[in-house]
Amino acid sequence: MSDPLGDMLTRIRNAQRARHAVCVAPASNLRANVLDVLKREGFIRGFSKEELRPGVAQLRIELKYNDGEPVIKEITRVSRPGRRVYSKIKELPRVYAGLGVSILSTPRGVMSDVEARTANVGGEVLCRVF
């Protein structure tokens, strides 16, 4: 798999279109950090890490709906393995005039664009969520 984070985002997108309550994805630290940001921003209910066997784990993602409609309207990968996208904090555009969130990988960890502006750090723009 060349883009594990992109795979997880696609699993979330597909599960929400199919109105699933839960989706699973292979576990990694980056994926868990991105899910933590999504949970803090209110886009998912939560997630848990399940150990399948020693050394192999998966993330169980609880999706969130509002009156039967998915909370996540759009989730797209920005920086890909073939085209990395980095942004200074002053050049980071707002997603849908502040209604959406960009998730960044910064030297201080994975955080939302709001947290990055507060901490005044830029980094790699992993994805956009609306």
Curated annotation (Swiss-Prot):
InterPro entries: Ribosomal_uS8, Ribosomal_uS8_CS, Ribosomal_uS8_sf. One of the primary rRNA binding proteins, it binds directly to 16S rRNA central domain where it helps coordinate assembly of the platform of the 30S subunit. GO terms for cellular component: ribonucleoprotein complex; ribosome. This is Small ribosomal subunit protein uS8. It comes from the Bacteria. Keywords: Ribonucleoprotein, Ribosomal protein, RNA-binding, rRNA-binding. Belongs to the universal ribosomal protein uS8 family. The keyword rRNA-binding applies. It holds the Pfam family Ribosomal_S8. Part of the 30S ribosomal subunit. Contacts proteins S5 and S12. The keyword Nucleotide-binding does not apply. Gene3D superfamilies: 3.30.1370.30, 3.30.1490.10.
